[in-house]
Amino acid sequence: SNADMKIAQEVSYLNMALEQVEQLNIQIATTQAKGGSSLASLDQRQAILDKIGSIVPINVVPRDNGAVAIYTEGGASLLDISAVTIGFEKQNTVTAHQTLEANTLSGLTLNGQDVLRSTALGGGSLGGYFEVRDVYGVQAQEQLDALSRDLIERFSDPALDTTRAAGDPGLFTDANASFDPINEVGLSSRLTLNSAVDTAAGGDVWKLRDGLGATTPGAVGDATLLNDLRGALEESRMPASGNFGTGALAAADLFSSFSGLLAVS
């Protein structure tokens, strides 16, 4: 995901910047010990410290001969004589099943030791990207999967289309198969139109009017099933999953609620 990539980029910059501050500390201390001017190095170091502080809030502690130590506001040491190495394993592709909680996405390490990111390295832009990946992204995925489930289940009632064989999927499918509630995670990425009416898959549009299991076209003017399909969308019902409140909602209301939740997040 984009957030995971951004985390990797920020960790890479932090490691480079901490090494630069370590070297500048040496230069400044050496110059001052010889009685020279280190103003240029001090300015360069301050610019780097400012950038580090925007990524992770820090406390800068003076040391002898103009050197500094760097600690996060959570108390983690990033540099005191020597810079630490911040570890993070980037994922090229993040799927709906991957979360930090499930240990399928990387957290952070300091010199190879796991740290509680929210405490040791919380705040700043780095913390923001973790929030997007591990909180808002997960919530949005759950809501989107719940929307997809609701859409499938609205058209799965056998009484809605009596031409379908028992157990066959309705108008919307889970990768062209019937939906199993235990497989809800990632459903939004598998949601597909039934191939019976998908012309790209060899289906026939007239089956929207005559039924997914119909073998021959029916009367052109018969809109009974089409009206029933519209009714399924407009029906107020309780979503089987997700966080959409406690009231019954039509499909349009669900999508509106989802959009509102994204805006708030």
For each feature predicted by the language model, list its residue ranges:
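Structural signature of extracellular appendage/secretion-system components
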Residues: 1-265
